[in-house]
Amino acid sequence: MRECISIHIGQAGIQVGNACWELYCLEHGIQPNGQMPADNTTGGGDDAFNTFFSETGAGKHVPRAVYVDLEPTVCDEVRTGSYRQLYHPEQIISGKEDAANNYARGHYTIGKEIVDIVLDRIRKLSDNCTGLQGFLVFHATGGGTGSGLGSLLLERLSVDYGRKSKLSFAITPAPQVATAVVEPYNSVLSTHALLEHTDCTFCLDNEALYDVCRRNLDIERPTYTNLNRLVAQVISSLTASLRFDGALNVDVTEFQTNLVPYPRIHFMLTSYAPIISAEKAYHEQLSVAEITNSVFEPAGMMTKCDPRHGKYMACCLMYRGDVVPKDVNAAVATIKTKRTIQFVDWCPTGFKCGINYQPPTAVPGGDLARVQRAVCMVANTTAIAEALSRIDHKFDLMYAKRAFVHWYVGEGMEEGEFSEAREDLVALEKDYEEVGAETADGDGEEEEFGEEY
């Protein structure tokens, strides 16, 4: 088996996790108490969904997941929520005091006390696997726990499970919407760790998700639940081929192979289609060609950046539902002829497609319509550098005055770490610039991008 272990860190990670596991359970017909009436091989078996769920002898399906937070309230919601019977009590680990939006608290003072318990729990989960494929880490880079404890855990996972792939789903700070003043600090410090210790990072930001909810689903004031359910659909599409059998299955390691041209260039842009409310879906023909076109719409991106400002290096299309390879080839060919999507000149083809016959599942009472087919796009594009440089710029404005730095230093961090992380990101921006530059004229003037702050 190719098992995956999910690790949900901090409030964002846990709440996205809730939405994901709710969706997985619906997709596989697993009840909130872990029973699965349709499953004939009790206590194991080589069913495809066993990559994400382990089975007990009593026929109960338990997610291969760990929930971690430094304060109890969010974990308590899982412990008392409708899926409380799904998890083993030891899978939900909470501390007593908050990281208080402070990377240093999550990484040094408070995170240090909890990290060994978490690693022990992960070790128990991995002992339970026959062929562990890797880890999916869910966190936000702007807070304290997701950034600090998140990067601490990733560092320790690199040591303990060196060869296993680590994919991270990171909620990154949005341009206008912020939940904390020190977001840029936390984000730069944790991106520094993500650069080194993850194989692939999927960037999502709340503002882009808000816009998608407002525009496509006509939700005037989207709540976190709306956003998380949207994110869950994306993550479900990415992991569908691990959990179901399909025509063109895509493995976690295949993502890296096809999407990451250089180890540092691994920040991905995602989008999903059709995002459409039930009233509209009734009147629209959502053909393969149409949904394929709409995932490339700049407005539908899950991170605030404009793919037209950058070049694509690689692109992965994950179809699910009633889709045949012939339609996919036609849709991709159309996109190639349109020339709206610019690839770097050293990577001419750049599309990897996966097809999964399991149609997308709609959450009862959710916002998304039930549709026959859907597609999720993951792209490695130089446009994501816009989002990175935006955070770097905000970091610079604050750090020039050393604002708020004493909170970090007081928790045992050194000021040198700030400049080290920032220099690493300067190098990353440069890397993105060079990757997107034309190969023919290597010595031309490099133009700075990042026009909009």
From Swiss-Prot:
Catalytic activity from the UniProt record: GTP + H2O = GDP + phosphate + H(+)
Principal location listed in the UniProt entry: cytoplasm
Protein name stated in the entry: Tubulin alpha-1 chain
Entry keyword Hydrolase: yes
InterPro entries (alphabetical): Alpha_tubulin, Tub_FtsZ_C, Tubulin, Tubulin/FtsZ-like_C, Tubulin/FtsZ_2-layer-sand-dom, Tubulin/FtsZ_GTPase_sf, Tubulin_C, Tubulin_CS
Self-association and partners: Dimer of alpha and beta chains. A typical microtubule is a hollow water-filled tube with an outer diameter of 25 nm and an inner diameter of 15 nM. Alpha-beta heterodimers associate head-to-tail to form protofilaments running lengthwise along the microtubule wall with the beta-tubulin subunit facing the microtubule plus end conferring a structural polarity. Microtubules usually have 13 protofilaments but different protofilament numbers can be found in some organisms and specialized cells.
UniProt PTM comment: Undergoes a tyrosination/detyrosination cycle, the cyclic removal and re-addition of a C-terminal tyrosine residue by the enzymes tubulin tyrosine carboxypeptidase (TTCP) and tubulin tyrosine ligase (TTL), respectively.
Domain of life: Eukaryota
Class of enzymatic activity (EC top level): hydrolase
Active site: E254
Residues where GTP binds: Q11, E71, G144, T145, T179, N206, N228
Annotated function: Tubulin is the major constituent of microtubules, a cylinder consisting of laterally associated linear protofilaments composed of alpha- and beta-tubulin heterodimers. Microtubules grow by the addition of GTP-tubulin dimers to the microtubule end, where a stabilizing cap forms. Below the cap, tubulin dimers are in GDP-bound state, owing to GTPase activity of alpha-tubulin.
Enzyme Commission code(s) on record: 3.6.5.-
Keyword annotations from UniProtKB, A to Z: Cytoplasm, Cytoskeleton, GTP-binding, Hydrolase, Magnesium, Metal-binding, Microtubule, Nucleotide-binding
GO biological process: microtubule-based process
Binding-site residues for Mg(2+), renumbered to this chain: E71
Site note Involved in polymerization, residues: Y453
Annotated Pfam families: Tubulin, Tubulin_C
